Regions:
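Single conserved hydrophobic/aromatic residue that forms the stacking wall/gate
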Residues: 2-12, 348-355
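Beta-lactam-recognizing serine transpeptidase/beta-lactamase-like catalytic domain environment
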Residues: 65-70, 74-78, 118-170, 174-353
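Conserved, well-ordered alpha-helix/loop/beta-strand core segments that scaffold catalytic motifs
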Residues: 72-111
Length: 355
């Protein structure tokens, strides 16, 4: 019996907790634990923590006579085994924050992720639109699933961890940290911005603000021009890196270290890795020596080929709050087994250093 405490919204039930379903023929072949008619986790925590939640099956061995009648326990029950209940999970989700996020996303398409920087615990995880989990139970499960699958708004799609979007201006703090680390700029380096960046026939528009501008106000005002200039100052520095490709690889390494381009390892199924291009990606398009900073300038402001999940973007904010490291985001705070009386701590305490 898998019980859930407190009243919960549909988003939380579907996206975080998930649901259970009858095991498939393939699962029966792959795992000797299951028997026909057993249930297993299908989505969310139910799937990720199935091995903890399902417990251990009990066993009773009986002695039968030649007519198949039970005569008693075999060897007085020496081979019997008591069932062990599954372990209880404690989640990190802040229910008030989760419910508030769900309210904000009603009738909208998108996602909300909130992370506690000091632990990596996910306090809220919202994807919209969603559906009622009860639709995927009972006799109508198959037809309901087909309708949800064909819905153009993709309610089955967990946008918080599966969707990949251009991170846009949320990417600029990352860029600023890289440029400082590589000494492409200082905190006092200024660049002009007259409603945008203009160079070699390329135009990247920007809004009206003071000019010239240095790094901190460039972040606070989200100046596109500043990051275009600074990006070129790093990528086109052949004296330091030798080639454009080498400079770009140095840039990419920082981005990956900050949690982009690969799965973060959240304890929920279906996480996307997003996309961070490497130098080979552009060399195949333009030739090894046919591109430079201006060619891929949209990358400098989180556009172009750069894609990130909402989880990765939220994790960057946690990394900055921690001044250069993050913990693997996770929704489960602890795992315990009240039957055995022990407590198993489930934590992601290894810090991932970035800068």
């Amino acid at each position: 019996d898998r019980s859930v405490s407190r009243g919960l919204g549909d988003v939380y039930k579907r996206q975080v907790l998930g649901n259970i379903r009858e095991v498939s023929t393939q699962e029966l072949k792959n795992d000797s634990y299951y028997m026909q008619g057993d249930y297993t986790g299908d989505l969310g925590v139910e799937k990720s923590y199935e091995a903890y939640l399902r417990g251990e099956k009990g066993q009773e061995v009986f002695l039968r006579n030649a007519y198949g009648r039970i005569k008693g326990r075999y060897e007085n029950g020496a081979f019997d085994r008591e069932a062990v209940p599954g372990k209880n999970l404690t989640l990190a989700i802040d229910m008030e924050l989760q419910q508030y996020g769900e309210q904000l996303m009603q009738n909208k398409v998108g996602a909300i992720v909130a992370i506690e920087p000091s632990t990596g615990e996910i306090l809220a995880l919202v994807s919209s639109p969603t559906y009622k989990p009860s639709l995927l139970t009972g006799r109508e499960r198959g037809s309901n699933y087909a309708q949800l699958f064909e819905n153009p708004y993709k309610p089955l799609y967990d946008r918080a961890i599966m969707a990949a979007y251009p991170p846009g201006s949320t990417f600029k703090p990352t860029q600023g940290l890289i440029f400082l680390q590589e000494k492409a700029v200082t905190p006092y380096t200024t660049y002009p911005c007259h409603h945008g960046f203009y160079s070699s026939g390329v135009k990247v528009a920007c809004h009206d603000h003071v000019s010239p501008i240095s790094l901190v106000p460039a972040i606070s005002t989200s100046c596109n021009a500043y990051f275009c200039y600074a990006f070129r100052a790093m990528i086109d520095n052949l004296d330091k890196y030798g080639t454009t490709g080498a400079a770009f690889e140095a840039w990419k390494k920082y981005i990956v270290d900050m949690g982009y381009g690969y799965r973060l390892g959240v304890d929920l199924p279906g996480e996307s890795r997003g996309f961070i291009p490497n130098s080979d990606f552009y060399s195949k398009i333009y030739g090894a020596n046919g591109w430079k900073g201006i060619t891929v300038i949209s990358v400098s402001i989180g556009q172009g080929e750069v894609l990130a999940t909402p989880l990765q973007i939220a994790n960057l904010a946690a990394t900055i709050a921690n001044r250069g490291y993050y913990f693997t985001p996770h929704v489960v705070r602890s795992v315990e087994n009240t039957y055995l009386g022990d407590a198993v701590s489930y934590t992601h305490l290894r810090a991932h250093e970035t800068l």
